Amino acid sequence: MATKAAFAKMNGLGNQIIVADMRGRADRITPEAAIRLAGDSETAFDQIMAIHDPRTAGTDNYIAIINCDGTEAQACGNGTRCVVQALAAETGRQAFTFETRAGILTATEHEDGLISVDMGKPRFDWQDIPLAEEFRDTRMIELQVGPIDAPVLHSPSVASMGNPHAIFWVDRDVWSYELEKFGPLLEHHPIFPERANISIAHVTSPETIDLRTWERGAGLTRACGSAACAAAVSAVRTRRTGRTVTVNVPGGPLRIEWRDDDHVMMTGPAEWEFSGTFDPATGEWSRDAQNDKPTDRGAA
């Protein structure tokens, strides 16, 4: 019988994260285990960030990302910040390089506790997002919610931050739209062969965007880092904002900078909640009796 793995329950602006220590192990977290953990009120999560041994020279770890429905994700900016906080507390280091399904990510913890993640370069070609049919201009595509002559939402910007995003621009409060109603329908729309993250965005100034997101494989979320990045770069492409903005998500603000080298930097906090151990095959878990913070004795 395999030994249990250590984990830390954390969050990035309310985006619920489990950071699981799978280093030195040959097994993987099963979809069944993920679904069981997601169904428990104490361990309910949006994503599991499973830290594995590195696969590629020059990286510190491979990070497998698992949604609460048991599917795998390519990217999770909020989860990456949680991983950095956990590993920084364990190792005393501030800078890390990770490999994910989306590619190589670098991240740094600052003296003020905020964490910056280089989310890489956005992609806008319809085949890279991907879309099921050709669109030469992905700043706006033909897609709408509601009646043809009076759509509730229409003409989203689409982009990939290693995962597909659709951003619907609106001119009033993002909370006035029933994202919980149409989010799952749009996530599974045929135009998105790999499904998509669906966001509503309201530009409130040249430096600020309000954003709500229906996250692919997770549902409504208080924060989605890659969606904030996708909204920021799409706002620049549609001439709504400058290249550095604050994206206000339900959980709080994220600072997004689309640099001149085309890389997107995301900066925000991470928060530790509790630690424990779990069975990667079944999802059976227990809370650590001591339950110290990672700054006291290391994390996941």
Curated annotation (Swiss-Prot):
- GO molecular function terms attached to this record: diaminopimelate epimerase activity
- Give the annotated active site: C76, C224
- Could you say which residues are annotated as the site Could be important to modulate the pK values of the two catalytic cysteine residues? H165, E215
Top-level taxonomy: Bacteria, Pseudomonadati, Pseudomonadota, Alphaproteobacteria, Hyphomicrobiales
Question: Does the entry feature the keyword Amino-acid biosynthesis, yes or no?
Answer: yes
PANTHER family for the chain: DIAMINOPIMELATE EPIMERASE, DIAMINOPIMELATE EPIMERASE, CHLOROPLASTIC
Q: What is this protein called?
A: Diaminopimelate epimerase
Q: Which residue ranges are recorded for the region named Disordered?
A: 275-300
EC number, UniProt record: 5.1.1.7
Which InterPro entries does the protein's record reference? DAP_epimerase_AS, DAP_epimerase_DapF
Localization terms from the record: Cytoplasm
Q: Name one GO biological process term.
A: lysine biosynthetic process via diaminopimelate
Major location category of this protein: cytoplasm
- In its keyword annotation, does this UniProt entry include Isomerase? yes
Among Gene3D superfamilies, the record links this protein to: Diaminopimelate Epimerase, Chain A, domain 1
